[in-house]
From Swiss-Prot:
HAMAP family: IPP_trans (MF_00185). Catalyzes the transfer of a dimethylallyl group onto the adenine at position 37 in tRNAs that read codons beginning with uridine, leading to the formation of N6-(dimethylallyl)adenosine (i(6)A). Its EC number is 2.5.1.75. This is tRNA dimethylallyltransferase 1.
Length: 300
């Protein structure tokens, strides 16, 4: 029987963490995180990282392994996770991958295009330009250099825009030319399970989760990482709103409201992305019995 990767997918706040723990305990296996922010050791509360108690229940990988200043790409994540899976499959025939970072999930399930590594000189040049000229200027430049990618990239995400320009400048080719979208075959079976809730139910959970984060000390966590606010790792819902409060631009009540609003918006983006994937079979998180039956029906 081939090794199996159970991929547990869903929007922020849907209930992936608790269900992934239950499934992992059932199979006596480990969990690999596919959350690009839970990688950072200093971002525990705002990323809803697994608690010490949850980490004690099931071994987790790719949680709290990076410093805020570390540069880490989806391509590096792909390489590191595939290497870790090879080790885990020596003792387990099933491993859980769970998270809401769409690009990280695709990196493991489908593979990342072989895009050249950006040299440090080009990276520093583009970061300086971003700081001095702003995102709008770089977006306009991307429109000229790679109009095809300009049409599909999230123009509000500086990391994506900057990276595309880095490739354009370093290679003299468009970023689009490297995006072959070739699906890489994996040496393990992939079972994709999506978790979903009614919108009103999900939004209520998101709102309550933000309130719990505030009670758990999100403001203090944001204050501790405030000196690093310019880093891409902190261009994240929960932290960027707290920074506005710490700057004196927003009241605390308004900042909390914006965290809730932006989290809801992000959940919609996640669902739009996930709905494109026809391999995902969808369940409500309370359907644990049906989920386990489905896994066993396809994993034999």
């Amino acid at each position: 029987m081939p090794d199996t990767l159970i991929v547990l997918i869903g929007p922020t706040g849907v209930g992936k963490t608790e269900l992934s723990l239950s499934i992992a305990e059932h199979f006596r296996t480990s969990i690999v995180s596919a959350d690009s922010r839970q990688l950072y050791a200093d971002l525990k509360i705002g990323t809803a990282a697994p608690t010490p108690e949850q980490l004690a229940r099931v071994p987790h990988y790719f949680v709290g392994t990076l410093q805020l200043t570390d540069y880490y790409s989806a391509a590096q994540y792909e390489a590191d996770v595939l290497a870790q899976l090879e080790i885990l499959y020596q003792n387990h025939d099933t491993v859980i991958l769970t998270g809401g970072s769409m690009m990280y999930i695709d990196a493991i399930c489908k593979g990342i295009d072989d895009i050249p590594t950006v040299d440090n000189e080009t990276r520093q040049l583009m970061l300086r330009r971003y700081e001095q000229e702003g995102l709008d200027t770089l977006c306009a430049e991307l429109r000229l250099l790679d109009p095809e990618y300009y049409k599909i990239v999230d123009l509000k995400n500086p990391k994506r825009v900057i990276h595309a320009l880095e490739i354009c400048y370093m290679t003299g080719k468009t970023y689009t030319s490297f995006r072959t979208r070739t699906h890489k075959e994996r040496p393990f079976r992939i079972i994709k399970i999506g978790l979903t809730r009614d919108r009103e139910e999900l939004y209520d959970r998101i709102n309550r989760r933000v309130d719990i984060m505030m009670q758990d000390g999100l403001l203090e966590e944001a204050r501790q990482v405030y000196p690093f606010r310019h880093l891409n790792s902190l261009n994240t819902v929960g932290y960027k709103e707290m920074f506005k409060y710490l700057d004196g631009e927003w009241t605390l009540e308004f900042a909390i409201g914006k965290i809730k609003q932006n989290s809801r918006i992000y959940s919609r983006k996640q669902m739009t992305w996930f709905k494109r994937d026809k391999d995902i079979v969808w369940f409500h998180p309370d359907q644990q019995t049906e989920i386990m039956q489905y896994i066993h029906s396809v994993n034999h």
